[in-house]
Design a protein with these regions (language model features):
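Extracytoplasmic
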Residues: 36-70, 88-91, 177-178, 264-270
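Extracytoplasmic gate region of multi-pass secondary transporters
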Residues: 55-59, 244-303
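Conserved MFS/SLC helix-loop-helix module at the cytosolic interface between two early adjacent transmembrane helices
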Residues: 86-125, 305
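Intracellular juxtamembrane helix-capping segments at the cytosolic ends
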Residues: 141-155, 350-363
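Interfacial helix-cap and linker-helix signal at transmembrane-aqueous boundaries
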Residues: 62-63, 94-95, 179-188, 273-274, ...
Length: 437
């Protein structure tokens, strides 16, 4: 009888017959344990996603507290984006080595300590340091890309849908946390709110983190970790017939391009409505409408990607996002903008999760944590770049027309990369395979 280790090196190892482990592994994939883990990932992702949104809400209060100008007060947000980007890559690599449990525990602890430290900051530098290092780089970063990579190990038939559900946690965080933070700030001030959030997050997230203690099923049989069904014209060592780093760079560049385009409505819709004379409140309603339909789109696109693969899902989403951006150029009426905003949310929600699906389809599974994190980090950087770039274009032209056209140009670049990769791809979409005992 052949034996294999469980692969868990944190809480002890034990040997069991490989055939039994193989059977248990197949029972876990797409099974009850997988769906429970997905639910836990959605919940902890929603909680941990606060690190990306809270700094925006407290920015005016921080500016007033420390007596700095708006540019200096915006520094913590910029450092948050940089910290998140750097942290995602390192946390992804750590996840590939030891699994997601330890990164998630580290994230829960860092978020709690980070918010307490931010609430006790004596100056803007200390606040920015706590925000960038503890809250973003160590705290929130393992709760998006690395968490999605972990979820991908637990699903085969429903992998695309599962990845979309996991990614939705970031949307839920953006919907739920800002009004909660604002409510407590009104009554208790920003410092007490930050400290309270830190204590709350540690108390709630640490027990949740232990739901990820169990290693992913495929990690239990070492021979199966990287096993995939190969076709004669598909070589995972050369995705799309390119070097792995070149293929990764193209996917990352596509992520930047799509999100520069995506950022135009998401970041500037409120200001756009104000400039058109509709008021800030109408713009905020359109943003909420956009995010709500984005959740629907994200889930639906996950189901679609299970049927046609991540690349084709990206192609469809990119094309439809371009259509919605063009509609923004054509229509400027209030009712029309409500409709276009709903369509934009419905069209673009599935683009970001498709990158995680593409990575799992075309790269070795053992690299999932790192490569998924790089791809998703690129989308975050694209949002940051687009938000700034479209603002610069508005300042230059005194109109958002050129900014929308700029978004269309970046969207065309994303669409071109998707078409190029589809043309390079050969054979059926790969799927994770098991190794017979």
């Amino acid at each position: 009888m052949e034996y294999a280790s469980t692969g868990e090196d944190t809480f002890g190892t034990f040997n069991v017959p490989l055939s039994r482990r193989h059977f248990e592994m197949n029972q876990d994939i797409d099974g009850f344990a997988a769906w429970m883990r997905l639910g836990a990932a959605l919940l902890i992702g929603t909680l941990g996603g606060v690190g990306m949104w809270s700094v925006v809400v407290v920015l005016p209060a921080v500016q007033a507290e420390f007596g700095v100008d708006r540019g200096a007060a915006s520094l913590p947000y910029s450092l948050t984006m940089i910290g998140y980007a750097v942290g995602s890559v390192f946390m992804g690599r750590w996840t590939d080595r030891v699994g997601v449990f330890r990164p998630v525990v580290a994230g829960a602890l860092a978020l709690g300590l980070g918010y307490v430290a931010a609430g006790m900051a004596r100056n803007l530098f200390e606040f920015a340091l706590a925000q960038a290092v503890l809250i973003a780089a160590i705290g929130s970063s393992p709760l998006f890309g690395p968490l999605m990579a972990d979820v991908s190990w637990w699903f085969r038939r429903y992998r695309g849908f599962a990845l979309s559900v996991c990614a939705t946690g970031n949307y839920f965080a953006g919907t739920l946390w800002p009004p909660i933070i604002n409510y407590f700030m009104q009554d208790y001030g920003w410092r007490a709110t930050q400290i309270g959030m830190g204590i709350f997050l540690m108390i709630v997230m640490l027990p949740l983190a232990f739901l990820f203690r169990r290693p992913a099923p495929v990690q239990d049989a070492p021979a199966a970790v990287n096993a995939v069904v190969h076709t004669p014209d598909r070589d995972l060592s050369r995705p799309f017939g390119l070097s792995p780093n070149m293929a990764q760079a193209l996917i990352a560049f596509a992520g930047v391009a799509c999100c520069v385009a995506m950022s135009m409505p998401q970041v500037h819709i409120v200001a756009y409505c104000s400039d058109l004379g509709f008021g800030v409140a109408r713009g905020a309603e359109m943003l909420s409408l956009m995010m709500g339909f984005g959740i629907v789109s994200r889930l639906a696109s996950g189901y679609i990607s299970d049927k046609i693969g991540g690349l084709k899902t990206l192609l469809i989403g990119s094309f439809l996002q371009g259509v919605a951006l063009a509609l923004y150029v054509i229509f400027e009426g209030l009712n029309s903008l409500y409709v276009v905003s709903a369509l934009f949310g419905l069209f673009q929600g599935g683009i970001v999760p498709s990158y995680a699906m593409i990575v799992r389809e075309y790269f070795p599974a053992k690299e999932a944590g790192t490569r998924v994190s790089i791809a998703l980090t690129a989308t975050m950087l694209g949002m940051a770049l687009g938000g700034w770039l479209n603002g610069v274009i508005f300042d230059w032209t005194k109109s958002y027309d050129m900014a929308f056209l700029n978004g269309l140009a970046w969207n065309f670049l994303n669409l071109s990369i998707a078409v190029f990769l589809i043309m390079r791809a050969r054979g059926p979409t790969p799927r994770t395979a098991t190794v017979p005992a």
